[in-house]
Swiss-Prot record:
Keywords: Cell inner membrane, Cell membrane, Cell shape, DNA-binding, Membrane, Signal-anchor, Transmembrane, Transmembrane helix. Residues 19-71 form the HTH cro/C1-type domain. It comes from Shigella dysenteriae serotype 1 (strain Sd197). This is Cytoskeleton protein RodZ. Residues 133-337 are periplasmic.
Amino acid sequence: MNTEATHDQNEALTTGARLRNAREQLGLSQQAVAERLCLKVSTVRDIEEDKAPADLASTFLRGYIRSYARLVHIPEEELLPGLEKQAPLRAAKVAPMQSFSLGKRRKKRDGWLMTFTWLVLFVVIGLSGAWWWQDHKAQQEEITTMADQSSAELSSNSEQGQSVPLNTSTTTDPATTSTPPASVDTTATNTQTPAVTAPAPAVDPQQNAVVSPSQANVDTAATPVPTAATTPDGAAPLPTDQAGVTTPVADPNALVMNFTADCWLEVTDATGKKLFSGMQRKDGNLNLTGQAPYKLKIGAPAAVQIQYQGKPVDLSRFIRTNQVARLTLNAEQSPAQ
C-alpha cells in the first residue's frame, strides 16, 4: 500500500522536482551539482524548474537531465515520460535546397552580361576605327585638293607662257645674215665672231632665239666705219653674262630636299612667291633659293629629307602622327608649325 502511494506521488512530481528532491536528500547544493556536471548554476536551476532554455538544444538538455539523474541515483527509465514533455525532440530545420533551375538562371544572366560587355567593346572599337578612317580620308582629300590646285596653277602659268607672241618677222636665216658682213672691215668681223659663238654653249635655245634677231639687225644695219666702233661695246656685256651663269654665288638660305618616295609639296618664301608646288618622284631632289623664312606643306613627311643652311630639319613629330606637315623654316633654322 505504501509502495503504490509512493509510485503515484513520484508520477505526480515533475522531472525537475524529482531531481531537486533527490539532490536535497543527498545534501548537495546547486553549486555542487553544477561543478560536478560542468554546467552553469543557471542551467541546473532551469532543469529543476522544468524550464527549457531557448538557446539550448533539446538534445543537450536531455543529456544534462540524464547526467543529473545518474548523479542523484534516479533511474533514467523513470524520467523518460517527463523528458518527452520537458525536452521534446525538435525537428531540425533543413534549408531548402536550391534547384538546378536557379543555377541555370544565374548562368543565363551572366551570359547576357558578358554579351553586353562584348557588344560595348565592339561598338567602341568600331567608333575608333570610323574616326581614324574619316581623319585619314580627310587628309587624303586635302592632299588631293592641294595637288589639283598646284596642277591648275602650273597649267595656267604654262598657257600664259605659251601665249606670248614671238616676232618671227625679225628672225632671218643665218645664211642671209652672214652674207652682208662680207663687205665689212676685217677687224670688225673678227671681233663679232668670238662674241657671238663663245657664249653659245652656256645659253639655252630661247636665249639664242632672242639674240639672233638683234645680231641680225646689227649685221644688216652695220656700215664699215660704225660697225668697228660699236662691236666692242656690244660684245663687252657677253662675257659678263657668261661669267654670271657659270660661277653662281652660293645662297646661305638654300633649301635642299631629297625624296625617298613620291611626295607632294609646296614651298613659299617670305614674299609669297611659290618656289615649287607639285609632285616629286622617288629619288628626286630639289635645290630652292628664295627669301627666308620658307613655308612648307608636305603631303608625306616620311618621304622627304630636308636640309636648310646645311643642317637637317627634324620632321619626326609629323612622321609619328602621319599627318600633312605644315612648317615654317626661320632664318635661325627653327621649324615652327
